[in-house]
Amino acid sequence: MLSVRRRQEDARGVGLRGGAAAGGMEDDAELEEGEACGDETAFVDPDVALSYIDEKIQDVLGHFQKDFEGAVSAENLGSKFGGYGSFLPTYQRSPLPQTRSPPKAANVSSRSPYHQPTESMSQNTLAVAAPSVSKHNGSMVPLSDDSSKKEVHQSTKVERASSTQDSLNGLSKSSDHNRFKVRIKVGSDNGLARNNAAIYSGLGLDISSPSSIEDSPDGCGSLSPEFNNVPIESPRTILQIMTCFSVPGGFLLSPLRDDLVQLTQKVVPTSKKWETNANTENVQERYEGYAAKRVKSDAKKKKAVDTKRSKSRNDVSAVMKNEIDIETPAGQKIVLEALNIPLLSNPRTMEAKDGSQFEEDPMRDTLVENKDARLKERTINSDLMAIKYENVKAEAAECLENSGPGSSGMDFSAVKGEVKFKAEKAEIHVEDRNTTSEKDFQSDRKQERKIKTESKCNATGVNFEGNKVMNERTPVVGRSIGKVSSKETLLNDINEENVSKSESRRSQKEQNMNASSSSDFLEDDRGVLSSGAVKERKNDSQSKSSHPGRKPKAKSHRDVREHLPEGSYGGKDDTLENGSGLGELRPKKIWKNDSERDSDMPGTSKREISSSLKNDRHTPAEEQRMHVPPSVSAPTANAAPMLPAPVVIEEHWVCCDICQKWRLLPYKMNPSLLPKKWKCSMLQWLPGMNRCEVSEDETTNALNALYVSPAPGNGVASVGHSHVASSGLTTSNTLNVNGHVEQSRKRKNTLSDGNVSFDVSQQMQGSVYPLSNQHAPIRSKSAADSIQFPVERDSKSVDHFVEKKRSKSKNHGSSSDGGHLVERSKKHSKVKSKREMDHDEYRTSKKIKKEERRQRQSGIDSNPGYDLASGDVPDEAKALPSKSMALQGSSERSDVPPSKYKSVSKYNSSEKSKRSKDGDVFLPEDKNKEHSYPSDAQKPDLSSKKRIVKEWEESQHNSTPPVSKMSIVNQSSSSKETCKDQNLKETKSKLTKSEEPFAMTDSKSIKVAHSNQTSRNLNNELFEDSTPFAVKSGMSEPPENRSSEQALDLAEPASSDLAYFQTTAVTSSSSKASGSQRRKQNFHVAKTSPIESVSSSPPRISNNDKVSHDKILGKDGSTCANTNNMQSLVKNTEVIVDNVRQARKSHESMLASEPVMNGFSQGNSDKDNELPQLTQGHASNGIISGRSLDDDLQHASGRKDSSLKSSNAARSHNHLHYANKNNLLTDGSSIQHRMAVLDTKGDSMVHENKRSVTSLQDRNGSTHYPPDGNPQSEVSFGKEKSHPKSNKHDMQNSKAQMLPSPLKESKVESHSAPLRSNASKLTAQLKRGNVENGGQHGITKQAISNPADTSSPVRKDNNSTGYALKEARDLKHKANRLKEEGKEQESTRLYFESALKYLHVASTLEPPPSIDGFKQCDAAQNLYSDTAKLCNFVGHAYEKSKKMAAAALAYKCVEVAYLKAAYYKYPTASKDRQMLQAIVQNPPGESPSSSASDIDNLNNNGLSKGPSSKDANSPQVTGNNLLLAARNQPHLTRLLAYTNDVNCAFDATRKSQMAIASAASNQENGIDGLSSVKTVLDFNFQSVNDLLRLVRLSMESISC
């Protein structure tokens, strides 16, 4: 029989053993290192015992007898092989007869597919065969007894191997040095011992050198030269022939099958081979019964392995020799038997068992054959091996491609000839190892893989892929084995695998960093590394395996997977790793794919392995498919409907220079075309989202929504994808590549390196689904996308991506975005493509698959909480944020924490202060964006993620590019509103608690009126003038920004505004259209400027103007009420409709105006109620749009809740009251408080932080100026006390009023604070009305309780302006009282003095010359207009009293006031004129901006209807048609306002000239007096203060 003996035994004089050798071996299995089997076998004479067999064998298998080399013997093969080798195929597959060195030859053979089947044995077999077996082996007649015994021994050996593998380090050392000499002796156990030389010669095994391999200097033992020339008929070859080839006339009876070889090949990953080398040697030795020798060899081998490792990867042969033992079919069989694992008849069967689909098996077989051929070639020449390595690389690539569709690990092994070869050995070893200790081998293999990957990492992904493929194959084998093998083995393997994985990852990372030529590494790794490195790795892995408790980082991922549902951990992660094209890391993971993971990868949790085994969701092919995106379509058990090849979308982001938020550019937009300085207002592709207030998530989601439909219809909601992309979050539940893609995209994809995704994205990003900061997910993004998914199956991939993202420095704080996939760090680069093709593809496919799987596995994955909980929604960002990204482009975003988190924090009082500090204040939305897009870095709570995702989906559904603000608001707000509303509520509550009306974050000085003061003022005064406004008096944003924002606001309100309130629009009592949009505007106000939002086109300004105007002035021209707020009004560029003042396009100005409205007097009750009671009606030149300030405030607060809470809650309808000459003062009821809320909540006011915010308290919030002498009824907050009762007192100077005086809402929400008796007086006065041209100015009774309270942020000293305003109001109130008492002359003088004071205040509100005054002159414009009306009233009174000189001065003041107002309206008027020219060309219903005009028309129609319905007595009612037309054409309205101011100024000039002429003719005041008057009339309007000084001098000269 054949027996394997060590030279040591020979030295010891151990004789040839007969059948008793089996028993000896049996004993050997239990022997410790250094111990030898009993020598009784030496006395067995095979010639005598088996003499009759020799002839038979010679006759039947003569040419094969020489194949019984190395560790392979009849004994080893056992009875199943027939004991005699009689079942071997008639034709032999001879490995190349010559190898460079015996070790090399051994290695080559082990690499050969032949050896792969008996992976474990082949390694040892090589070692043994090399030294002892010659080409011409004598006939071998193994005894059946011996073989059976041998099998027993092998099983025991296997057991020992498992135990010994724990101590592989020592064993490997001994195995390295202890080489087996294969001796074939024929004879019975009892037969006389034959001379060794005779036996060898008879068998053709003439080997002169008795020295053992272990004696070789290299520690691997040198093979005899004969061995080098050993033909392909090595034991390994024989085993392969037995298993793989049929005997002529029929198939082999051998139990071994082709699949066995393939199986071993599967198991063979180099790491396994390496591990196997050490383990296999031990096992082989056990098999042969030379435990002692094996031990020795192992001890030496360990050293040798290290030496080899250090020496050269080329010394594969030596290592392979060691490996041969196990690789031999006998060894493999033994291993299987020891494990009680039925030999796999077919890899497919195995796969079926594993649950994995081994469609690759046929391919494997072919590959295996090819492998065999290649192996032979390698055997012939190591050089050829190197060449083959190259071939293998190509093949590996092919295998990967094939495997992607569904080829099994076999294909991989086939692809990599060497790898397969090694894999075969490794597989055999794995089997042995499984027998002995799969974990050890697995860990070893892992280590080998690590080592290979390390060397190969530098090289190329192909190496990794090849290794991966091998690994995958190996996992398949290991998996099947693992199933059979005890869980402990799996656990050990897993642990080892984890260790090896972590090491491999580290090594791979290092290698990646140090990447060298891929081809070299491939060759070296496959060839040289396979044996030496493998051994080393085995040793390492064994040592590691011996410390399974030590789990590598990689393990953590697997651990996560372990916790994940079984099906989930596999393909996805691998796919992510592999598919991601993360060459090095993925190869490891790939190799560890389900099968490997299951059996080979200790890193993989048992559960994971078992799940793969049980669920078999991912076959290696499946994993490969996952790895290979193109092949994703390959049918896999897990595969959801085949995903279309991921569409690689180059995602570009642009960063706003103002808000630093990232905006996803349309996929085909070239970022290079963008201007250097880019602002959110330039975001024209999303009509309603071109505001800084809009969060990144919103814009990303909206944009992605446009591209969602293209997403594969896998049943995955496009919204979900885009949302996921936006958030950068992926559902870990789905194992599909889509999930990977999704994750990858998460970030915030947003990943700077292009690995978006996550979000974040990466995101996934991750934030949640877009959590912008997910986000990041997203995108996060987020980077992770920094989100690690709780779900284990995704955890690996996710971790991998996260690592990548992190390594790639995904900046998603959120995720990707920021919280955004695009973090602040990304700010430096405005435009960047966040996602790479690979990531996009993988993300997309993974995302889709995940969705599909989620749907399919609703039972398992349906739990959205699970997905979210698992962190599948990475981005977060990723959403996206990674940033939120659509399947194609959105990311991150991934991984992104829910926007609400940021928003919440922003809403904090500290945030308020921050806003005040920061010139630019971002609304919670913006913050939310950051949060959402933090896709990346920040993980929102899962619940928050879920919510965000849902919201995002909703927003997506609604996010169709909003045509109008309303629609947008409804859409985006639906998603964000919840979080934002909550945030706003919290903020609001905080603000209310703090009683801070609002903090305007103004780049300029901000004076916040305390709500207490405001309330006191309100309580004390109805008069608007007395209450300070909280307004941003600072410069408004540049007009370009404003205009762009305004245009955008039309659609913009959607996301940010909606977030705060969707219902608000409905809530406002004022015209629903305008109100809703107003809310949007207010929301914008909170974010940008509420006014703009009202109408996308400039007309929207009119609404804001109303607010601001009302706030600023009692329409009557008692501008004082809001004069404190004038600056804030100034910010409101919008012109009051009355005054035809347009709000400046800039949102800031609009915001400022609204804050002003909100800033109107707020009583404590207001604070308590949080009710801004606003009577809003601006009669600008008779055009009055009344809009409830409450609505504005509500909008500003950004909440429906912000609607007035108390009885005041009844919103004053936008009553456009036109008191004939009576301008109702807008009562800004606790607007200020509301505004404060707005500011804190939204940046509506703050957003215009650039402008200094003046907090003016409108005590009564309204001042009444009789337009053209008409007293305005003032509405007290608690009451709508004053209606323009003096309609009879329509201005006789109606002509002076081109349009009705500013409208005031007659209706004012009741204010809890009692009105002062003055209010009643005022009411009485109003009732009386002035008969004269200037009816009494409706004077709000409230006296300013405290000048300090009324301080307003004026560019000049706030206090001085406040005092001046207070004095003007006091004078006006006093004049009203005197007029009621019938003292007309005194009252007229006081009115005039009051008008002069108002002019002074208006002049102080003018922006400095250095500043673009046209942007900030709303307050001044409004005050000038109202003052002009008051002056006109005074002039009319003087004319009646025949004081023509005084009348001339009054009219001069009217002229100056109107000219000043027109002066500041001119820039807008000029544009409007141009627009009107175009409009004239267009059909009446159309305007240059259709969307804006639509909204404006809607709002304007409602507004125009409001005035007519509310004040039927108003002269404007008659002008309704005109008003409607004007409203429909905001440009026309503004132009008319401008024209009206100019006309009024010229009319006043004419009147003054007539008056002075009349005075001169009458010579009533003497020459000096007339001269002074003449001087005044000749004075220009530029220097108001100088003019006022001259007027006072003239008044004294004329004794008036």
From Swiss-Prot:
Domain of life of the source: Eukaryota
Bias kind Basic residues: ranges: 547-556
GO molecular function, one term: sequence-specific DNA binding
Tissue specificity of this protein: Highly expressed in young panicles. Highly expressed in axillary buds. Expressed in leaf sheaths, flag leaves, nodes and internodes. Expressed in roots, culms, leaf sheaths and leaf blades.
Predominant location: nucleus
Zinc fingers typed CW-type, residue spans: 647-700
Subcellular location: Nucleus
GO biological process, alphabetically ordered: positive regulation of DNA-templated transcription; regulation of seed growth
Biased composition (Polar residues): 92-126, 161-173, 510-520, 957-976, 1010-1020, 1090-1105, 1172-1183, 1252-1263, 1342-1353, 1487-1517
Low complexity bias: start-end ranges: 896-908
Subunit structure: Interacts with TBP2, a subunit of the transcription initiation factor TFIID.
Domain notes: The CW-type zinc finger domain is not required for nuclear localization.
Annotated function: Transcriptional activator that acts as a positive regulator of grain size. Binds directly to the DNA core sequence 5'-CATTTC-3' found in the promoter of MADS1, and activates MADS1 transcription. Increases grain width via direct up-regulation of MADS1 expression. Promotes active chromatin modification at the MADS1 locus by increasing its level of histone H3K4me3. In GST pull-down assay, binds specifically to histone H3K4me3, but not to H3K4me1 or H3K4me2. May facilitate the recruitment of effectors to mediate gene expression.
Name of the molecule in the record: Cysteine-tryptophan domain-containing zinc finger protein 7
